[in-house]
Each structure stands twice: as C-alpha cells, then as structure tokens.
C-alpha cells in the first residue's frame, strides 16, 4: 500500500467501528504510525483550525504539515484514493458522492444508538454527533423494515405456526415502539427517539442472528 504521510484521522475512540477501520488503515500501510488520534486528545493549537462540531459528525483528516482538514467522505476517499486512485475517482463522481455522503451521515449520526457507550464525563472534549431528527427517524424506519422482513421470512419456516404476512410483522415491529414509548411521554422528543433507536437496534441485531438460518434454508432449497 502507498502510505499517506503526515496525515492524521481524528476518530471517535468510543465508536468501535471508527476504531476498527482507522486501525486497519495503519496496519495495511495506508497511514503511517501517527495516522490516527483520539478526538478527545486534540490540542489547543489543533482546535484553532479544526471545526470541532463538524469533526464530531464527520471524521476529520488532519494534514499535519499544511494544517488543513478534510471531513467525512472526503477524508476517507483521500486515504483510500492514495493507494487506489480509481476508487477516489469513482467516489468523486457527483451522483456517487452524493449517495456516499448520505450513507456516511446515516451511519455517523446514528452511531451512538447503533452501538451505545457510557458517557465519559472526565474528558475535556467528547466526540458526540449532533442530534438529527431526520437521520434518527430514517434509522428507526430502516430497522423496523429490516426486522419485519427477516421475521416474515423466518415465520415461513415454522410449520407449526400460522403463516404470517409482512404487514403483521411490520405492525408488531412498529407496535413495540409505540407501546414502550407510552411510558416515556414525560420525556422530550430527543430522549424518546434515542430510546426508540436503541430499542430497534436490539431488534435489528436479534433479527440478524436469524439471517444465517434463512441463507442456509435458501441454499438447501436451490
């Protein structure tokens, strides 16, 4: 791999996925040994030219020599494109980049509900994404649909149970949010949506555990 020298990714150390792929960039040689740095370890000098709010939402790539910063998809395309220029070229196509930015935002704004973590009050600065109603609701809808689809397909394998339909599974998946949210009405909308996001993450991960069985059944019946 071609190493991108003097560049540092500022990652959210409380995000397992962020930690995984930034470490991966270093191990495969895309970045040098100083190619990643926890967001909470930013120096006062770095905070002068880094947009802290933007870096909380989109991983920042710091050019240590020129003191410039790229954010989000631009930073990832820069790192990957240094070793694979064609990927950067494809990623910068207008329509593809638009999709990549939306996908990145969808994951980034929801990363704290996808994999929750304890708050570290002792840190001077924390990498906490801004709350987005749009992306939180989209995540909840996505999780409901995926959970319902998985349960619908799995129910077809249960011979001793009545044949279900997608609408029923959809109502059950959505209904659990409504039922449990009744007990949260005294809280604000953000708290309710955060809880709903965490709830649907559990449901989504649970349904994903059934996926290997569905795949195995599909292969057997080919």
Each language-model region and where it sits:
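Local sequence-structure signature of Cys/Sec-based thiol-disulfide redox active-site neighborhoods
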Residues: 2-31
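N-terminal G-site of the GST-like fold
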Residues: 31-54
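Thiol/selenol-based redox catalytic cores and closely related redox-interacting motifs
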Residues: 46, 52-157, 208-221
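Membrane-interface interhelical loops and short amphipathic "cap" helices
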Residues: 157-163
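Hydrophobic alpha-helical transmembrane segments
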Residues: 163-171
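Alpha-helical transmembrane segments of integral membrane proteins
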Residues: 170-222
